Amino acid sequence: MKILVVSDTHGDRSRVIDIYQKLNKESPVDVIVHCGDYATDARELQARLGVHVAWVKGNCDGGFSDTDWSILETEAGNFLITHGHNEQVDFSKQNIYYKALENDCVGAFFGHTHRASYTEMDDVVLMNPGSLTRPRDGSGGTFGLIVTGEDSIWGKIYRYEDFMAPSGTGSGSKGSAPKPKVRGGHLRDLLNYSDRF
């Protein structure tokens, strides 16, 4: 199964449409996962593209409901879909990891932070596709791609500009977007200085 994973589009669906059309030329996208903010974007994408969009509400979609999280069934196993704000993903991935385990999932898709990440914790895949329209990591916008088989899960985070470049292959290493340069200040200098004793 070929799964396009996006989150935090905040009303701008154009990049998702561009990516979907390019991916579909290679082989059909089976499902788009939208991890919230905005749920209306997910519904509009499904209507416009004619592909199933599995979606959940985000913190900007208002209220609590049965669409705060859901399960996507694949041949490799189930994936939890959630926005991540209720699992406090800003601070740690532990809560989302445990929620995936509690629901017998092999992985979890989430958003909220606007920062892409792809990790595995004890063979549980955790993917945050970041945000295509409002990234907070200096990436210029990111999305995720997951391909599942009966005994396999392959995943990668792509930068939008790299993926849409004429070469068509995108760049970046498996499972992660390039990280911004770390900036430090006075506290960092103090901590580094204290390590010298």
Walk through the language-model features, giving the residues of each:
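Conserved beta-sheet core of the metallophosphoesterase superfamily
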Residues: 54, 85, 89-154
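Binuclear metal-dependent phosphoesterase catalytic core
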Residues: 18, 103-104, 127-197
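N-terminal active-site segment of His-dependent metallophosphoesterases
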Residues: 1-48, 62, 67-68, 139-142, ...
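Glycine/small-residue-rich loop that forms an oxyanion/phosphate-binding "nest" at active or ligand-binding sites
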Residues: 43, 48, 54-60, 66-85, ...
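Active-site neighborhood of phospho(di)ester-bond hydrolases with catalytic His/Asp-centered motifs
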Residues: 5-7, 31-37, 54-59, 80-83, ...
